[in-house]
Amino acid sequence: MHPALYTRASMIREIAAAVAFISKFLRTKGLMNERQLQTFSQSLQELLAEHYKHHWFPEKPCKGSGYRCIRINHKMDPLIGQAAQRIGLSSQELFQLLPSELTLWVDPYEVSYRIGEDGSICVLYEAAPAGGSQNNTNMQMVDSRISCKEELLLGRTSPSKSYNMMTVSG
């Protein structure tokens, strides 16, 4: 299989989890019909897959994590903004529907988020690496993912929050 096709296929579940999470915010407010939500979701999935295609490293999940991070911090993430434009949603409407501070990490085998700068990090999606049946390999992957989040927390000036884990296994 061509490496680009393998990469795109390997990120489908992670992207779907991230898009479903963002779409729930839009659905909750009830300002959009089902067709608009589907168009938004499909557009965002396509945009993320294209954006991540050369930055997806299942063998090193932390590599490229910052590039793949979806971020709203009083400024809209450009990919979410593009998907919203495709359904005629203005940036002002989008800011009313989504949290003003949201960080969403879309990494191989894990999708996690944080709402607010001092919020807890919660896991949306988690999967074991495919083909790695050796416990030692799997343990290294888990340690690697944890260290990605630890790197983020090391730069924090306020006391760190405890992790509240919400896990959905695929």
From Swiss-Prot:
One of its GO terms (cellular component) is nucleus. Pfam families: BTG. Gene3D superfamilies: Anti-proliferative protein, N-terminal domain (3.90.640.90). PROSITE patterns: BTG_1, BTG_2. GO terms for molecular function: enzyme binding. SUPFAM superfamilies: BTG domain-like. InterPro entries: Anti_prolifrtn, BTG, BTG-like_sf. It comes from Gallus gallus. Disulfide bonds: none annotated. Anti-proliferative protein. SMART domains: btg1 (SM00099). Belongs to the BTG family. This is Protein BTG1. One of its GO terms (biological process) is positive regulation of angiogenesis.
